[in-house]
Amino acid sequence: HPVISEIVFKGNKKIRNNELRENIIIKPGDIFIESNVLLDERSLRDLYIKKGFMNATITNSFVESEDGIKVIYFINEGASTVISEVRFEGNVVVSDKTLKGKISSKEVGFLKDGAFQKTAIEADKQAIINYYMTRGYIDARIVDVLQDSYFNAEKERTEVIITFIIQEGAQYTFNGLTITGNEIFTTEKLESFMKLKKGAVFN
């Protein structure tokens, strides 16, 4: 069985060789298995997407020699996409700062890469709704998420402004409602199960 003699990356500028190597399973000295090379190609692509390089493409080739097989990954990074700003509209009772703390999408800045990931938007929407529910706003919903992008030529990257449009709805509180129809538990027992006191927020 031929072994891998060397692994080479070509075309990468934004992500260093060491970090790329940490994200692949093959290494010099391993028996060459083409399916592992393809798996690693996918891992490298996932790494680029995670860092905001949505259009990165990666291909591979291998060269046989007496020493074994040299695996070459050809990388076309494309422009990165970062979040320049996160905005909220329709939020009255919850501040922008609080909502920003609840979502995984972060604005680019010092110590923050601000990588834009489309898949994070759905999770962010749910995180916002979940927070509103803990505050008793059980009708809260995200009406829309706007994504305005533009190319920053100076920084050679695409920048996105994300706007979450929120409909908060009414707040529900528990005002000592009498529970009827229960024959097994006392009302007091049910209320303790619900962990709700008079005036407490209902969610």
Positions of predicted regions on the chain:
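Interaction-mediating elements
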Residues: 1-203
